[in-house]
């Protein structure tokens, strides 16, 4: 066994807020004593923006603006140059989670075209003959809860051939009448999206009904913007030709890391939508879309 580095963060869930102290230990393990030129710890937060393949041709001039946006970057020395004894050595550290100037700590978010990530990187510098050691560890930032109470915004909906948009041959569609409601499209990110759906009538047999959560990511600048919608998760809420006039509950938990409070900045936007998708046996696909506003309470 050679020399290994590890970073252990004090909080088990690794979740921190702006202004808090990030603390833990750097663990150095070695069977022999280790000579080193110093051990440092770097905290970094970046927003990585990426264009989808379909946008690249249109936005070549746009590449300059899609450089990673740095939110936070600071380094502290954990150990001065010297010698570490054999065995396991734990060096405690504390890092204030503070940003400079008008910058904002956006919430951690792992998307497709927008990625907001915070990392701690430990570097042990060694002499020319020995390889430098590096260890990286991710921690999670949550935005501050919004002030005031969340105002519910219930939505009632009906889906019929007449309410559908983008239909080429409306006359060929089988007759159906589906109604339901969402309890709120203003959603606390820690609470599930809930509602119900009732199929009152359908000439064609129903194959399945699904609830689909979609992220809409926009990367933009002076030259233009690219807007892409991608699926986060899909939940089947009914399988087969369900009974008519039966209330089917809608229930969806927002997945951690893959969702964040709805975010709008000068360079990028992260928004969320939910689709109610009904698939009929004649391969007709019916989709009803609802924009959501997510926030942390």
From Swiss-Prot:
One Pfam family cited in the UniProt record for this chain: Vps26
Superkingdom of this protein's organism: Eukaryota
UniProt protein name: Vacuolar protein sorting-associated protein 26C
GO cellular component, one term: endosome
Record's keyword terms, sorted: Endosome
Function: Component of the commander complex that is essential for endosomal recycling of transmembrane cargos; the commander complex is composed of the CCC subcomplex and the retriever subcomplex. Component of the retriever complex, which is a heterotrimeric complex related to retromer cargo-selective complex (CSC) and essential for retromer-independent retrieval and recycling of numerous cargos such as integrin alpha-5/beta-1 (ITGA5:ITGB1). The recruitment of the retriever complex to the endosomal membrane involves CCC and WASH complexes.
Annotated GO biological process: endocytic recycling; intracellular protein transport
Coiled coil: none
Residue intervals passing through the bilayer: none
Subunit-level organization: Component of the commander complex that is essential for endosomal recycling of transmembrane cargos; the commander complex is composed of the CCC subcomplex and the retriever subcomplex. Component of the heterotrimeric retriever complex consisting of VPS26C, VPS29 and VPS35L; within the complex interacts with VPS35L. Interacts with SNX17 (via C-terminus); the interaction is direct and associates SNX17 with the retriever complex. Interacts with SNX31; the interaction is direct.
Gene (UniProt): Vps26c
Organism, as annotated: Mus musculus (Mouse)
Family: Belongs to the VPS26 family.
Compartmental location: Endosome
